[in-house]
């Protein structure tokens, strides 16, 4: 093996006894190494194949043990010090810039070992890294690579200090160096070639271990950083979402005003329904906020941020509705000058809200059914089939069950859209929300008109007692009309139209109760009077009837008796029919509404010869 050119440099020497003390301070075994069976192995000046094999075996056990890399490397150099006739040993792992990142040593005093990182022979290490070849220096005191590092190797004991360094490589990349130094007296007892081969084998094992440790450390750092990022994002999302969730729980985030139990349950159901892509059917009287709930479901769903497209099916004739929903090709009909996308295409990836779906004709129902079943359609005048991904929300105030029984509405379409029905209660069933709604509408009016009007407590009481057959929409109109015509900034009962006999509800429903339009949400405000047990001719005892809530006391609007807060009392048969329709023709549910037993309801059905509707 070629040696480096050297030149003599005089350095201070100390006694042999001192050098021996320094070397012995970190060498645990000198002269013999235990065999696996317990017998010692005699050490020679060179590294024999037997000793090398045992050394590789011992070092491989250290390298595969689950310890920190610093501890592992320190154990390796300690084993080397027990096997080789060496004074000092060093494993230096480099960082990406080529500077010492981790140094494990043996043979130095604790004081010197603590400063070794700042005194490593950097020039020698750089040459090993640059050439990727072992470096053997017979006399470090005479080699310029070690100039300035004489103190690092200690007193030479009247002999020459030699240096052997090999690169630590993995995947053809130098990751550091493994080096030792020893006393060389110039005789043939020292076989540098054998030591270089042995140290190269050890360095290769160390290189693989360092590479694995760095990969694990890199993955760990990446996972820790990713965890920190996710935790930070979660904290930010949680801090930003907590008010949003709280608002959604009471409906304010969705624009829904009301904190009655009915509204809270409906909002909670809407939040659950919004998570899926199931079709939703919103049912309720006109003015109960079906479009508001449809938009809320869209905003709470994963499709938030995608299009929300709405179509009023009752406002368009069939020919126009088909073109509106499916689009048309250029020249499909007179006036079709350009191709036009339909609402289904515009809502791709989002939500399509079909209001008043109960008003479409049976012929168009078949076309709509195909889109709901297959998710595909053709534009008017076209022959290319288009596929869309749309979440459908429908709404109606029509009795679809009755329409199905009369053949006015297809049963297959009914079952297709009646996947998740949400029944919106009329305003008269939640009078406790009226004050909050009224204040909300008045605040909007004030903001639009830059006013500061208020509702007096007696005025709120008047609103709570009114019937509002037009529900929330009528309440909003009432507030706007009253605020517009009020003479003062504070609205009083005398400012309402019913005080002067101009109540729209009284004019609309004068002398008769409104005709039920929904099987589940009747417009009549009168709570059902419990039917009497058989025979039904006698009234039920007063104790059997639940006391009406204060919110639903039968009072009339002030100033006129024509405003029917309570429409005329229904007959027992009408009450029974209404309860059955509200309960979906389930006798047990109807019995609970009437405060009767299912057996009594069954008797009443037979008495009045009422057939059970089945769908």
UniProtKB/Swiss-Prot annotation:
Q: List residues of the GAF domain.
A: 68-210
One GO BP annotation of this record:
phosphorelay signal transduction system
What keywords is this UniProt entry annotated with?
Answer: Activator, ATP-binding, DNA-binding, Metal-binding, Nitrogen fixation, Nucleotide-binding, Transcription, Transcription regulation, Two-component regulatory system
Q: Return any one Pfam family short name.
A: GAF
The region called C-terminal DNA-binding domain is annotated at 573-615
Entries under CDD domains matching the protein: AAA
Q: Which SUPFAM superfamilies match?
A: GAF domain-like (SSF55781), P-loop containing nucleoside triphosphate hydrolases (SSF52540)
Describe what upregulates or represses it.
Answer: NifA transcriptional activity seems to be controlled by both the general nitrogen regulatory (ntr) system and the O(2)-regulatory (FNR) system.
What are the DNA-binding region positions?
587-606
Ranges where the record places region Inter-domain linker: 485-572
Q: Which positions in this protein are listed as binding a divalent metal cation?
A: 498, 503
**Binding site residues for ATP:** 284-291, 347-356
What residue range is the signal peptide? Answer: none
- The residues covered by the Sigma-54 factor interaction domain are 256-484
Q: Which InterPro entries does the record cross-reference, listed alphabetically?
A: AAA+_ATPase (IPR003593), GAF (IPR003018), GAF-like_dom_sf (IPR029016), HTH_Fis (IPR002197), Nif-specific_regulatory_prot (IPR010113), P-loop_NTPase (IPR027417), Sigma_54_int (IPR002078), Sigma_54_int_dom_ATP-bd_1 (IPR025662)
What is said about its interaction partners and assembly? Interacts with sigma-54.
PANTHER family, from UniProt? PTS-DEPENDENT DIHYDROXYACETONE KINASE OPERON REGULATORY PROTEIN-RELATED, TRANSCRIPTIONAL REGULATORY PROTEIN
> What does the record give as the function of this protein?
Required for activation of most nif operons, which are directly involved in nitrogen fixation.
State what protein this is by name. Answer: Nif-specific regulatory protein
Annotated gene:
nifA
């Amino acid at each position: 093996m070629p040696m480096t050119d050297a030149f003599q440099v005089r350095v201070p020497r100390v006694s042999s006894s001192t050098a021996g003390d320094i070397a012995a301070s970190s060498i645990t075994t000198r002269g013999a190494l235990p065999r696996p069976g317990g017998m010692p192995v005699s050490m020679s000046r060179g590294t024999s194949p037997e000793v090398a094999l045992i050394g590789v075996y011992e070092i491989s056990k250290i390298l595969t043990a689950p310890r920190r890399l610093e501890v592992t490397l320190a154990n390796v150099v300690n084993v080397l010090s027990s096997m080789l006739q060496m004074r000092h040993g060093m494993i230096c792992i480099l960082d990406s810039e080529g500077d010492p990142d981790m140094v494990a040593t043996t043979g130095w005093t604790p004081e010197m070992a603590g400063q070794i990182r700042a005194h490593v022979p950097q020039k020698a290490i750089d040459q090993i890294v640059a050439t990727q070849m072992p470096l053997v220096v017979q006399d470090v005191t005479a080699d310029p690579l070690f100039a300035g590092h004489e103190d690092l190797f200690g007193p030479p004991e009247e002999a020459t200090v030699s240096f052997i360094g090999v690169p630590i490589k993995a995947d053809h990349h130098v990751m550091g160096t493994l080096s030792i130094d020893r006393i060389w007296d110039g005789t043939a007892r020292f076989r540098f070639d054998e030591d270089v081969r042995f140290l190269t084998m050890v360095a290769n094992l160390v290189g693989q271990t360092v590479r694995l440790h760095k990969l694990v450390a890199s993955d760990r750092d990446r996972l820790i950083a990713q965890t920190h990022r996710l935790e930070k994002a979660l904290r930010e999302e949680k801090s930003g979402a907590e008010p949003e969730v709280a608002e959604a729980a009471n409906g304010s985030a969705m624009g829904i005003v009301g904190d009655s139990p009915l509204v809270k349950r409906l909002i909670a159901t809407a939040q659950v329904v919004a998570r899926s892509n199931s079709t939703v059917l919103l049912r309720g009287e006109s003015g109960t906020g079906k479009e508001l709930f449809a938009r809320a479901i869209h905003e709470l769903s994963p499709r938030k941020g995608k299009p929300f497209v709405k179509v009023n099916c009752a406002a368009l004739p069939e020919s126009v509705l088909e073109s509106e929903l499916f689009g048309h090709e250029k020249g499909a009909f007179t006036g079709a000058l350009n191709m036009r996308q339909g609402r289904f295409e515009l809502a791709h990836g989002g939500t399509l809200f079909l209001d008043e779906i109960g008003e479409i004709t049976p012929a168009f129902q078949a076309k709509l059914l195909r889109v709901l079943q297959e998710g595909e359609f053709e534009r008017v005048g076209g022959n290319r089939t288009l596929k869309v991904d749309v979440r459908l929300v429908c709404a109606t105030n029509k009795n679809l069950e009755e329409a199905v029984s009369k053949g006015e509405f297809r049963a297959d379409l009914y079952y297709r859209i009646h996947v998740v029905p949400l029944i919106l209660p009329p305003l008269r069933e939640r009078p406790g929300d009226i004050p909050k709604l009224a204040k909300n509408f008045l605040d909007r009016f004030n903001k639009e008109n830059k006013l500061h009007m208020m509702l007096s407590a007696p005025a709120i009481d008047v609103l709570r007692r009114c019937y509002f057959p037009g529900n929330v929409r009528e309440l909003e109109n009432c507030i706007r009309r009253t605020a517009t015509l009020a003479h003062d900034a504070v609205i009083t009962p005398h400012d309402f139209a019913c005080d002067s006999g101009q109540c729209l509800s009284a004019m609309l429903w004068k002398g008769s109760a409104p005709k039920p339009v929904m099987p589940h949400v009747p417009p009549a405000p009168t709570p059902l009077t419990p039917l009497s047990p058989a025979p039904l001719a006698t009234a039920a005892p007063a104790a059997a009837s639940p006391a009406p809530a204060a919110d639903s006391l039968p009072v009339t609007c002030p100033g006129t008796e024509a405003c029917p807060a309570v429409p005329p009392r229904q007959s027992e048969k009408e009450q029974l029919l209404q309860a059955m329709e509200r309960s979906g023709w389930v006798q047990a549910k109807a019995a609970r509404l009437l405060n009767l037993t299912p057996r009594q309801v069954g008797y009443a059905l037979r008495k009045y010869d009422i057939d059970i509707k089945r769908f």
